[in-house]
Amino acid sequence: MANIKSAKKRAVQSEKRRQHNASRRSMMRTFVKKVYAAIAAGDKEAAQNAFSAMQPIVDRQASKGLIHKNKAARHKSNLTAQINAMQ
């Protein structure tokens, strides 16, 4: 454990940020999973609606640095291709 006052403060701030980021990351993953679930169910309209809800969330997390922008692009590209391939 830190002994210096500033190090203690940084440890508290770091833990607070970790919890905040974990919450945001979990929320983002839930939105992505909803799209995958709709694709697996074969419901194209539900998949498109879930994708529309997921896209700004993923973009926002990428812009804030929670995930890399290429990861956000990869999620969107893969899911778009899967939705378009549906009947």
Curated annotation (Swiss-Prot):
SUPFAM superfamilies: Ribosomal protein S20 (SSF46992)
GO terms (BP aspect): translation
GO function terms (MF aspect): small ribosomal subunit rRNA binding; structural constituent of ribosome
Database matches in Pfam families: Ribosomal_S20p
Matching InterPro entries: Ribosomal_bS20 (IPR002583), Ribosomal_bS20_sf (IPR036510)
GO cellular component: cytosol; small ribosomal subunit
Region (Disordered): 1-27
Keywords, sorted A to Z: Ribonucleoprotein, Ribosomal protein, RNA-binding, rRNA-binding
Free-text function comment from the UniProt entry: Binds directly to 16S ribosomal RNA.
Family, similarity comment: Belongs to the bacterial ribosomal protein bS20 family.
Descriptive protein name: Small ribosomal subunit protein bS20
